[in-house]
From Swiss-Prot:
GO terms for biological process: cell motility; cell wall macromolecule catabolic process; cell-cell adhesion; defense response to bacterium; glucose homeostasis; killing of cells of another organism; peptidoglycan catabolic process; signal transduction. Residues 21-231 form the Ch-type lysozyme domain. Its main location: secreted. It is an enzyme of class 3 (hydrolase). This is Probable GH family 25 lysozyme 3. Residues 1-20 form the signal peptide. Keywords: Antimicrobial, Bacteriolytic enzyme, Glycoprotein, Glycosidase, Hydrolase, Secreted, Signal. It comes from Dictyostelium discoideum. Residues 219-472 have a biased composition (Low complexity).
Length: 480
């Protein structure tokens, strides 16, 4: 009898494992080829594609990606990051109507409304944000679209407060615990008591494509497909982001939450914005380490990395992109604070004697960091840099920076370096700096000693872009 029971349990376990599904989500800055999708289909049964980015609007690559994904054997869902303070179409009902119109004839499973934080994206009044999100979801439902919500335990209350009226819609949540299951119960927010999909890992790479990883129970092969003109039976890929590190698209709080987002061209973990090495509920996108900011404000959810710093000044709706250094909103430990801004920011890869500018929190080891203020600990490296800011397309100069040495020694010398980075869709922010270190002092937490030096820097920075962009929830995320 005992052997029979064990045999039955074994069969049930095997069936359960076999019926579970793997999915990936990609940001609007990612445009995989047919061969990429064929490769991805060997490891996944679903793909969720970002179709709308903040104030930038529709991702024109969606129709061709959907067609190629279906040909590769993948079921397709879409996600949209909308925000009340983004440029472009600011009315949520109008944005949804425009999106649905552009998706006319495109068959997909579920349209996920991505709810996550990003710099300058939302009103400071939670009730206003809640009304915005409700209108977006309800408008999509009224238009006959299968609609769900993507968010995380940390992002939801930060954005819409105690809103519970949408709990009857499917939930895709983010919790970066690298555990493809619902055992974490990270879906207990907003009135939900269950979820349909979990984003359990932020930006990583499969088949050379930057993706977030998702898990859902069951085969996911029999959901109703939405299009503006017809319905048919097809698979519904489900998605989500946030958690003890959540990602798509932005900065963190709680055990850290965030949205999704990932792009191939130097994207953030996106997507917001890599994934966190500790707990973080912020959807962030790819990048092993992140310091960045546009010299324009960003309406995209920031992307993730193992360390995070981001800030924006000026105006720009572009989600920050990843590179060797990139925008992030996700902490490498647990953090309940939104990311802080530095006095100057450049994102992307850096060459020269110093690294990327921007303020950075967390710890870094043996890495020269450039920039405004720094907290945390650093290896036996000294850093110096000038601060830089500018509005989109503008040239400005700034001077004065502090340099720090973790060992208490001071250094003198001159250094030059240039940095450039690219946003998901458009133009790059770049700047150059040169200067000699003279004298001065700086201090940081967990650092001892003093260093002296002054630096001046001048350069131009700006960001512009049109077309497809990434968001944070971490579709961040994106899932941006």
């Amino acid at each position: 009898m005992n052997k029979l029971i064990l045999s039955i349990l074994s069969v049930l376990l095997i069936v359960s494992i076999a019926s579970a599904g793997n999915g990936i989500d990609i940001s609007s800055g990612t445009n995989p080829s047919s061969s990429d999708l064929a490769c991805l289909a060997k490891q996944n049964s679903k793909i969720i594609v970002q179709t709308w980015s903040g104030g930038y609007g529709f991702n024109s690559n969606v129709p061709s990606i959907v067609q190629a994904a279906k040909s590769a054997g993948l079921s397709v869902d879409l996600y949209a990051f909308l925000c009340s303070q983004c440029s472009g179409i600011t009315d949520p009902a109008e944005a949804i109507k425009t999106l649905v119109s552009k998706l006319n004839g495109v068959k997909y499973g579920t349209l996920w409304i991505d709810v996550e934080q990003c710099n300058g994206c939302w009103s400071s009044t939670l009730s206003s944000n809640a009304q915005y999100v409700q209108t977006a979801v309800q408008t999509a439902s009224q238009l006959g679209v299968n609609v769900g919500v993507y968010s995380s335990e940390g992002e939801w209350p930060q954005t819409v407060g105690s809103l519970t009226s949408l709990s009857s819609f499917p939930l895709w949540y983010a919790h970066y615990d690298n555990n493809p299951s619902f055992s974490d119960q990270g879906y207990n927010f907003g009135g939900w008591s269950k979820a349909v999909m979990k984003q359990y890992q932020g930006t990583t790479t499969q088949c050379g494509v930057s993706v977030d990883l998702n898990w859902f129970p069951g085969s996911g092969s029999s959901t109703t497909s939405s299009s503006a003109t017809s319905s048919s039976t097809t698979g519904r890929p489900l998605t989500s982001s946030s958690g003890a590190g959540t990602g798509g698209h932005s900065s963190s709080s709680g055990a850290g939450t965030g949205g999704h987002s990932s792009t191939t061209g130097g994207q953030t973990s996106g997507q917001t914005s890599g994934q966190t090495s500790g707990s973080s509920n912020q959807p962030l996108s790819s990048g092993s380490s992140q310091d960045s900011s546009n010299s324009g404000s960003s309406n995209q959810p920031l992307s993730s990395g193992s360390s995070q710093d981001s800030s924006n000044s000026g105006s720009s709706n572009q989600p920050l992109s990843s590179g060797s250094s990139q925008t992030s909103g996700q902490t490498s430990g647990s953090s309940n604070q939104p990311l802080s801004s530095g006095s100057s920011q450049d994102s992307g890869s850096n060459s020269g004697s110093q690294g990327t500018t921007g303020s950075q929190s967390g710890s870094s080891s043996s890495n020269p960091l450039t920039s405004g203020s720094q907290s945390g600990s650093s290896g036996s490296q000294s850093t110096s840099s000038g601060s830089q800011s500018g509005s989109s397309g503008a040239t400005g100069t700034s001077s004065t920076a502090s340099s720090t040495s973790a060992t208490g020694s001071s250094s003198t010398g001159s250094s030059t370096g240039s940095s450039s980075g690219s946003n998901d869709s458009g133009s790059n922010d770049s700047g150059s700096s040169s200067g000699s270190n003279n004298s001065g002092s700086s201090s940081g937490s967990n650092n001892s000693g003093s260093s002296s030096g002054s630096a001046s820097s001048s350069g131009s920075s700006g960001s512009s872009g049109s077309g497809n962009y990434t968001s944070g929830s971490g579709n961040g995320a994106f899932l941006f």
